[in-house]
UniProtKB/Swiss-Prot annotation:
This is Putative transmembrane protein ORF88. Residues 745-748 are cytoplasmic. It comes from Ostreid herpesvirus 1 (isolate France). Residues 535-570, 656-669 have a biased composition (Pro residues). It is a single-pass type I membrane protein.
Amino acid sequence: MIIMKSIILLLAWFLTKTQANMLTESLYLSEYEGSVVLNIIDKNLNGISTLSIFNDSTKLQEVRYVASVCSLRSGSFNITCNVITYGTYHVRMFLSGLNMSAFDLYRLRYVYVGLRDAINYNPKYAEAVMAPFALIGNNNIVTIKLIKDGDNITVGCGFGNVDLSTVNTHASKIGRNINPRFMVGVYTNDSNKLIEDDIYSRYTDSESAGVMRKCNLNEVKTTPQEDCIQPFCTKGTVYGNNLVYGSRLRCFSRTRCSQRSRTVPQSVPWYIPSGFTGKQFMYLDNRLGYLLGLDLTTAIFKYTPIVVGHIVSEYLTGIMNYKRLSVRKGPNIDMRGIIGGEIKMILIRNYRKMLDMSGFTPLPVNGCYVTVIKFIGDKRVFNRVWTPSNNTDDGEEHVFVFHQKRSSNIRDYTLRIFPDSGMDTEGSKYTMNTITDVGCSRETHHKSVYPATIKKAIERFCVDQPNISCEYVKDIDRVDINPCGCKQRANRCGERYSNNTLKATIEFEVPKIYDTPYTCEFLGYKSVNSLTFDSPPPPPTTTQAPPPPPTTTQAPPPPPTTTQAPPPPIVINTTAAPLAPITNATLPPSDVITPEAVNLTDDTPVVNEPVNSTFINDTDVLDDSPTTSAPQAPGIVGIIVNKITTTPAPSIGRAPIPPPDVPVEPPRSIPTTNAPSPEEDTVVLSKSDIMRRFLIRLKTRDGETVDIYTWPELNLAPFKTLSYAGIGVVSFALLFTILVVCLIKFSI
């Protein structure tokens, strides 16, 4: 009897221990698919870190913990990432497809570290971001230190962990055109400390390479060595991430910039050893002060890791790094998707099978912004709608609508549109820049300036792919291109596309510049379990009820036409898995987007009430016209931003809604609280929700409606898959213990 009881107790302890170990293993992710190993250590710091990891298997798991230190190990190569948090800041790092050896960092596809003020998203705080290429430094250690007011800054760089006070010493040993490219924050010229509510910038010269210099408002600083150094002077906004890559800045000064200084140099010194091509690409909007990126060495990195800083008052979407680079031909990198305003995404070429979990849906913060990227094999449909933020007082409230479409045989493209001489009036000039294969022996950077009313541009690019060679850019206003650009591919370019035949088309439009800020409203979101992106619009259903018979006062319904049916109304399907409310696990209370009224039915008008004063302009008059009934797609759950009309926009590459094949369940409401309690963090999405695509519907002021399909993203639906495993294991342990005890009792 004693032995039997001992066995029972031992079994119960073992099951409980197994459950605890399972959760621990889930936290450490040692069993995680791929070669990602994440160690989360509680440093008991004053703050919460959100560390999210997903890989090519599209599995996504979120671990929230108090501070963290992560170690990524594979083979003999170790990467240590020290993440330090302060206060209520959140840190996120996305790592995907990690498979490292001694010098093979090329599978580090995602690196994303964002700092948020979880209380009110105060722009006075700076954000520190650290690139994986800093791993080349001492002992392959990267220190990511998030800074707040008064903190000293020490971040890793090519020399290892370098303090600001030692930057000049390091720079002087290598050359004058060296910036501490990984130093982030807002500094004075004589202090390491962050200064709040002031505007500073950094410029490069031979004596003070990379030192942050105070920038008076609306002042343009120049040096004898560099003619076009434009500080980030924008009245009313503090830019904490004034990173500078390369020795020359892309200048947007209206008075003191020369055309000859508008492009980055062919090569500049760099402190990453052996093989760096010396080609840095950096674009700055003088109103945004936004760094976009750079390329790296081919000898050390076969995939190009990139980290981008962002304006701290805005939301950093993330980084996607896909393209495997050719050591022989040099890096092949493009910085993508920029239209003057908020800059949210950087894409790197890749022609392998893309990640299924590749959609990023940043939430609107100060304005309306949605970015969605869909990968279907080698084909990408890329739709964007956004406006600049409204946190400046220089009249920069604009609406930008950007639609892109590529034929199935064209696998990549790049489009950049920058404000060239200001965007104060309609018809302002914009500059489109394309950068192609940076490993080519000749400059492939070119510009085309065109009015805001131009609708189409064709972009030229060279790709390091056997079946894709060379394209070019052309617009109806002006053409300034290098016909092929890549010398070593000139023959193939000529053979495949004689006379530069058009093979890729990018359609864009900047419809108008408005006097009032563009406002946006989050009404709800729909999930689509399966989509056919390239299929034609769904045929008219034959199960609809017949129209009522005509009366003497009502004309008979018109005969059916071949025009496309209007988009369906937003109805929440209760058959879908429970959706997690947006909690402070990933968003500050001010950014929680669970709407006040999202229980939309066929006869419910779209309620255009401000959801959040952070990004809704209460003074803007919104159209309160109701939506129109339409057949409901199956399993739809979704995001609708701003007003909805029944007139589909001429959106390029928009995926049609699949025809309904299941009855529509009664709608349900989404929690409407804007300040969720910490307990709500435990609400999770099921694994099926991870693969469920989302529909986003946007409407511009010009009446265009844009439907975008994407995948859920952590910003939209924080969840923990650990909860299900833990509950299941605990329940099984308890039930098994009770069963054994009962059996023993009855046997006795």
